[in-house]
Amino acid sequence: MSRYLGPRLRVIRRIGKLRGFTRKKPFRRVFKGFGGFKGKVIPPGQHGLTKLLKTRPYDSSESDYLIRLKVKQRLRFNYGITERQLVNYVRKAKKIKESTGQVLLQFLEMRLDNIVFRLNMAPTIPAARQLISHGHIRVNNKKVNIPSYMCKPKDVISVAMKQRSLQLVNKNLQEYYRRMRFYKKRLEKTLPFILLKIKPLGLTSVTAAVELITKGNVRVNNKSVKTPNYICRPRDTVSLRTKQGIKKVFLKNYLKG
């Protein structure tokens, strides 16, 4: 079955980020001028700025058809299926007496290539398709080389007991765990988690810390911060406005390096 082999960043810039499509991150241009267009993302292409300035600043120029088309294209590109495959999945979903959209997503999620991707055996769905088509994956101890194979509950997905197969999957898993460790360290330096570590503040959950930040009750280095994903540094000073007054905390004791 044919699949998309064209430029991927162009697709992502047009319809949004797709985790299963590629690991690449596009460069998004933002209009830095004044007026209603300030902060708007410039559409992709050579004449993207012209397209942006032709639209009304406070109104969406996307029609209902374009919105639905983008949703359909996101499904098609993310799961790596053709138009005909998607139509067949929709027809099958309509025959079941449940929510058609929910059943359609179940069909797409039960594909073998998607399950291999969800198990972090491959970084993307196209990479998972390659693992399957090269015979590295087993389903119930049987070789399956069809990426669109529909798995069932209680199926056992395993790796072929070959040196090359085990090397490929172990390499992908190690890369996944390395990224998770990096994200965990970065998450622990965000403002809500730092506020949760400070016992004198008396916060019991991350949700409570995020609520304080979004309300503007937290200042870092005498500057108001309303973004929960703010990365703190050891030299920062956090000021929290409470009913008892303003509490200042130096982050040297709560951050290492």
Curated annotation (Swiss-Prot):
Subcellular location: Plastid, Chloroplast
Main location class: plastid
UniProt keyword terms in alphabetical order: Antibiotic resistance, Chloroplast, Plastid, Repeat, Ribonucleoprotein, Ribosomal protein, RNA-binding, rRNA-binding
Effect of Q73P: In CC-3008; suppresses streptomycin dependence of the S12 mutant P90L
Family: Belongs to the universal ribosomal protein uS4 family.
Complexes and interactors: Part of the 30S ribosomal subunit. Contacts protein S5. The interaction surface between S4 and S5 is involved in control of translational fidelity.
Protein name, UniProt field: Small ribosomal subunit protein uS4c
Domain S4 RNA-binding per the UniProt entry, residue ranges: 110-170, 189-255
Pfam families hit by this protein: Ribosomal_S4 (PF00163), S4 (PF01479)
Entry keyword annotation includes NADP: no
Chain's role: One of the primary rRNA binding proteins, it binds directly to 16S rRNA where it nucleates assembly of the body of the 30S subunit.
Any single biological process term in GO: ribosomal small subunit biogenesis
GO CC terms of this entry: chloroplast; small ribosomal subunit
GO molecular-function terms, A-Z: rRNA binding; structural constituent of ribosome
Domain of life: Eukaryota
